[in-house]
């Protein structure tokens, strides 16, 4: 569970000794982050959190451009402070540089989060790659990782845009991913809606099938999916979000072994359709075909996941074709058992030079179809 502790606006969703602008002293008068942590851990879930405080340097800046209450004098502790001009997001050296006062406050707030809530993962949004943050981010990472060691916990920072040295955290790709599997840990954060991270009355929901396909594609490439839902102001989860989560839970109950704790196989996929490299690539659904498969391994089994169920119930997985040349980097193992997860009957299958043929007449599914392959 990964609630936002503080977003760009600078209002803390937790009890803080560093600012009065927080949910414990104002609004609901509750430590929402602390309550979510307790609820998550009581259900056996890991608690993580995110900070977007870095972007507060400029988030209120446009308020200076018209008649508003964003005006001088402003000082540390004011809600709008410092309201600087919005920089070019691609400029790592944009001016004015964040001040020492702001950076010290950023560091103190993040340390407070770590000490009070002990998150397993700590996510930062994009602006920490600015040159001014680098010495502070190094101090923060050292502090957090040393805390994790003292707690006996494996903790990690999620970062974007090479804000940290490669290998010192988890590479984050917002609303996107990679075309090929990566040899390092990475994560994509995306939402159930295409047009918003939070609840609105005009959400453009993705389908449950699309989100499950994203999950499968990401895991097959050594990634993790961080899926955002947006509660209403009263804390209730919108029906559209609930339906997606319910569909995912039903699918995971049957097919979870193919993704939960699964690793990358020698190849991540076959078929004509693939994701593209980079961020903000989910504006339109990727239209997978019955020829598209993703592969994972778990517990000594290979999992072949068909991204769209063929209407005739006949599957062909070319990556498991018989090979006459043992020198080629192809599959040369012996298939012993082929199981369609969630199917009560026995799938008929055979292997030839074309591939692994599986026949399940009459089988239909709107979601990815998972085959467990037991091999020698």
Question: Residue locations for each model-derived region?
Answer:
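Mature catalytic domains of secreted/periplasmic carbohydrate-active enzymes
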Residues: 1-376
